Regions:
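Conserved, structured core segments of small domains
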Residues: 1-148
Length: 148
């Protein structure tokens, strides 16, 4: 199964503050994940002050420039892992160095697989989706292929 591991933002991450020791520990941990064959992709995110949010309401789109106030709901970084179970992902996250200089939360969410859409789309479309997914995995440059 594939999971997204989500590091929640904090006041420090939103201020763009990085602790060099925490960064070095995370770098070493990521190397361990890659060597174990767990890590597929991932990166830290810039503070929301450098981003935007698009709100959908029917056919209307409203753009709000960052920063965004509700820090506990924001994401500071993410990783995509391939694990055998949710418990394996939990066990790896427990080994995480704290990604911020403050208390922090890390969320784990399984990714939907093409089979999760059975009953919503036709079997033919499921095959097309699987082909698209394979092409995405095999591409060069930025993307999932960079951690092969």
């Amino acid at each position: 199964m594939k999971v997204m591991v989500i590091a929640k933002a904090s006041a420090a991450s939103e201020a763009g503050e990085m602790d060099p020791e925490a960064f070095a520990a995370m770098d070493k941990f990521i190397e361990e994940l890659i060597n174990a064959g767990i890590m597929l992709d991932g990166t830290g995110l810039t503070p929301t002050s450098r981003g935007a949010r698009v709100r959908f309401s029917g056919s209307n789109r409203t753009v709000t420039d960052g920063p965004f106030a509700e820090t506990t709901e924001l994401i500071a970084g993410f990783w995509i892992w391939k694990v055998s179970s949710l418990q394996e992902a939990i066990d790896w996250v427990k080994k995480f160095p704290n990604p911020t200089i403050e208390d922090s939360d890390v969320e784990i969410r399984p990714l939907m697989e093409p089979e999760d859409f059975a009953g919503v789309v036709t079997p033919e479309r499921l095959e097309e989706v699987k082909e698209l997914e394979a092409r995405s995995r095999d591409r060069d440059g930025y993307g999932l292929a960079r951690f092969k």
